Amino acid sequence: MMEGLKKKFNSWLWGPTSGSEIDISLDGKVVAITGANTGVGKETAHEISRKGARVIMLCRDTVKAESVRKEIMKDTGNQVDIVKLDLASLESVRSCADTLTKKEDRIDILINNAGVMACPEMKTKDGLELQIGTNHFGHFLLTELLQPLLRKSTTTGFTPRIVVVSSMAHEGPMWPWPFALIALGLALLMPRFVKIYWMLLPRFRMNWDDLHFQKIPGSYEPFIAYSQSKLANVLFAQELSKRVAKDGIKVYCLHPGLIDSELWRHHKQKGSIGSFMLAPFEYFMKTPFLGAQTSLYCALEPSIVNESGLYYSDCAVASPSPVALNEDDQKKLWRISEETVGLSKKNT
């Protein structure tokens, strides 16, 4: 009962959530989703499987993924596969892409959903700051390597889509934890007017001189690093949409909402200040099911099939930070990304 009330309250608070209600058959379609074993990714996979697609779960934890795979297949009766993917390892990303290239004839929809948020300072296996390494660089490499499979989807008459899950956090915060919770509170309690808050802050930008917080000891701030990784998502989606337009691939970027999911795990440890400060907000957060709605909308909605390079929130076009629309920054991030993951122009 409480979950039902929360769902209704969330729908009123956050606006329309119509992704699951899209009447479309995905019979015969192949949809790959990163981080599909938990939270928003799990709900996205479940709903897409219900519409007839064969879902490929790209997950680091294959044990948890297997349990979810069985759950989805039991409910929908449709095939669900698992391919191991650790986005914090470029070697794992390449291995995943190689497996898919050998096994699959095509991929119709790719949803870059997985992510890590506001974690303590850590590095990927390649020495990158963990959040931008996982949320951006890992997905950048995966998307580039899977483009041949996505292009093959066009031969079936289908318009392939790439969905990039970002966050409104790409606009900030400039302030470190715990002040970032001020933004969270305003976003939850006044979602219709949250832009006013962001307008009061200096424009958040990529730290081009030190993307990985290595030059100044102690400069790492979890929420600033997260915001940077989410801004990278939007910049990437913008530039990607231009580069794949000639191939007939459409690109969508989105803010899923503030969601009560495992993303908060680093701040919900029992007895921590984060757990104490988050407690009043949890009821106002979207459930993972509601958080999946805009991903589903971008992946499935027929009326936006000719749109590409736009940013969405609550199943509607929204305005990203003006910084994300800077074409020089889009190109700069692309060059840095190619160098970081070891892709030359002739490889892409």
Which role fits each region the language model picked out?
Residues 322-348:
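C-terminal amphipathic/interface module of NAD(P)-dependent oxidoreductases
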